[in-house]
Structure formats: structure tokens, C-alpha cells
Amino acid sequence: LAMMPHPERTELGDKLFSSMKEYIETSVAINEKKISYKPTEKTITDYEPHENSNVWIVDLIITDNEAVTVENALQQKGFEVEVSKQTHWEISCSKNSSATLKQIDDSGELYNSNKEYLSDLPEEKETISILIRQKEDVHCQKKFDSLTQRFKIRDLLQLKRGVVWNITIKNANFNSIFNDILDTNILHNP
């Protein structure tokens, strides 16, 4: 049982543990039921930015520990891959997008120029890039609110954020390995 704050450190937590003890001592019969679940088939579509939107791809200057962790996990599962991660911003403006983009860039709100820089997607043949977006992105909404309210950037209409996973697979059947990687759900939470 994992709870925060730790119940064993408070008097109120005693009730939880005494209840657990009582449950264990009464030997309640466990009614096992089989669970059958078949996840829905994943559909991947080619990304098309919205009309009048600009795309920023942000790379880290330093090593991305999350990408290294994902790469190590995939390699432990037997996949010979290299993994990198980038942040994807889709910025929709009402007019004069170059001036609006300059304001957004100057704000430092979407990326920290001391640690990150604007980049491009990799273009190697063995690399595939996958854009993953959250269904409800609170972080992106906070950035949008900050840009429109705090920095008074009125021409910003919409902001979308995602993570781009770049997976390089060398010397193998790319499609079958890629589908096996997707089946691990390590890149996203379905």
C-alpha cells in the first residue's frame, strides 16, 4: 500500500492499519474473477499542422534523461534502438505571425534558451518520429494563459504541445520492430 503522507507517521493512520489487521485475521474468502480486456487497435496518422500555424521543435542541449531511460528500457526488452526526445509546439496566430513568434520567443516561456534550442526533426532513413500529445494538457494551457495574459500576446490563438519520440532502428525489419515497440506502451499511456 503506497499512500502519501505516510499513514504510519500519524495517529489517524492507526485506523487504517487496524482495519487491515482485522481484514487479514477474518480470512475473508477471495472471490477470483477473470478479467478479459482487449485494448483498442492503435491508429497512427500522419501529422498535418493546422492552417496558419507554426511548428517549433525544441531540443535539449544537455542529455535528456527521460530519452536515455526509455532507450535503456527498450534495449532491455531486446530492441536494438536509439531514442531521442524533442518537444513539439504548434503555435496558431491570427495575423503577422513573425511578430507574434518573436514576442513568444522573447518571452522565454516555451523554452529555456540556456538549456534548449529550436531545432528540426532528424532526417535519417532509419529514424521514425512519433508525436504524442496528452488528451488534457494542463502544462500547455498554463503556457497559453501566461503568454496571452501576462505577456499580453493578443495574436496568439491556440497553442498545442507534444513530445516527439525519435526512434532509430538499424539493420532490422523496421515495421515489425516499430509495431512491437508501440505495443509496449512505453512511449505513451493509452
Regions found by a protein language model. Name each.
Residues K34-P190:
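Core nucleic-acid recognition elements
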Residues L1-P49:
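Amide-donor transfer/coupling interface in amidating biosynthetic enzymes
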